[in-house]
Amino acid sequence: IKTILTKSGKEFVTSLSITTLTGTKTFENLFDKELEEEIDHIGLSRWADIIIVMPTTANFMSKLTSGKAEDLATTVILAADKDILLVPAMNVRMWLHKATQKNLEVLQDYGYLFVGPEKGEMACGEFGEGKMSSPRQIFFFLKNYFHKKNIVKDKNLKALVTTGPTREYLDPIRYISN
């Protein structure tokens, strides 16, 4: 797994945490002088078997719909020749907003794949559709995806994950965050 940490994602998790969990460098900047010759947004987009944006915010969906290429995550996605899986997570009102639903339609027409969102209690305390799908649901989607694509079991699958902010509350005090 290679991970791109967005500016918003940095508000919730550090690149050190992600690097420690994945065992690989976390990419953050479009122009990284250290990696200029080693890898770029084109290289990252070609490396992966699938690109996963998790969680996908309403803002990020809007950027993809309009074709913005303003950071590493959006340039990798625009340069990609692979399937892109979006895992939406946002407040129920944001998810139901006409602009978000229009962006959903457009992105589906572009060929983006979606898992979720699910109905449930949000971090803000409201209930409804907009909660990020569980890791288990995402895993089963990916398992089916790779099976349908006929990718062999022993192949070292490559996933590029872009991260942004989300919190899944276990109770009023404790939460899991990416």
Which sequence ranges carry the predicted segments?
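A cross-family phosphate/adenosyl-ligand binding-site feature
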Residues: 1-84, 91-178
